[in-house]
């Protein structure tokens, strides 16, 4: 899939149901495809039955290389969305983010593409992945857009990272790029 996906605009895969006793696909399959294909991956959670994906989009923004890659990859979807929101967490801890202007950079970038966004107030939470998923549910989000593995996978494995949490627990489809 990773090799064939390199010549695709978007790879769409389902996430393994971790409650299955003998899953057909390895639990880390979405992660593997994202890390090795060089293409955006749309991951659909098990049991997702809503009629829409991409009408109400939430971008998890931290000004990283992975984050802008995901946003750029999502532009065709964002142009058709009814609502695009940008959320940032712990902006005071991000070396590449000016806390006073947080979100204005990505809002301007998207405006150049004709996409109107709502920049949510910066959030503070030490469990970003869990907080992001909860906020997504509160906002009736039907697509999360985020960069995957801004830190090394080893660090995420040790500390429990946003990517790992979202990949493992999201009930909302996720578009990720690395």
Predicted stretch roles:
Residues 31, 72, 108, 133, ...:
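Active-site phosphate/pyrophosphate- and oxyanion-stabilizing loops and adjacent acidic/basic residues
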């Amino acid at each position: 899939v990773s090799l064939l996906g390199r010549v695709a605009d978007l790879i769409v895969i389902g996430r393994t149901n971790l409650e299955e006793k003998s899953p057909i696909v390895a639990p880390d399959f979405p992660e593997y495809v994202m890390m090795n294909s060089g293409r955006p991956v749309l991951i659909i959670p098990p049991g997702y039955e809503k009629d829409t994906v991409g009408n109400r989009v939430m971008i998890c923004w931290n000004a990283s290389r992975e984050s802008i890659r995901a946003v750029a990859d999502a532009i065709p979807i964002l142009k058709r969305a009814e609502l695009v929101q940008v959320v940032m967490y712990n902006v005071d801890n991000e070396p590449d983010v000016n806390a006073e202007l947080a979100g204005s950079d990505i809002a301007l970038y998207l405006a150049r593409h004709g996409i109107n966004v709502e920049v949510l107030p910066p959030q503070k939470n030490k469990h970003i992945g869990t907080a992001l998923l909860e906020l997504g549910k509160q906002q009736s989000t039907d697509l999360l857009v985020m960069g995957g593995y801004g830190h090394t996978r080893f660090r995420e494995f040790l500390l429990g990272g946003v990517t790992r949490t979202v990949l493992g627990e999201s009930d909302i489809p996720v578009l990720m790029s690395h």
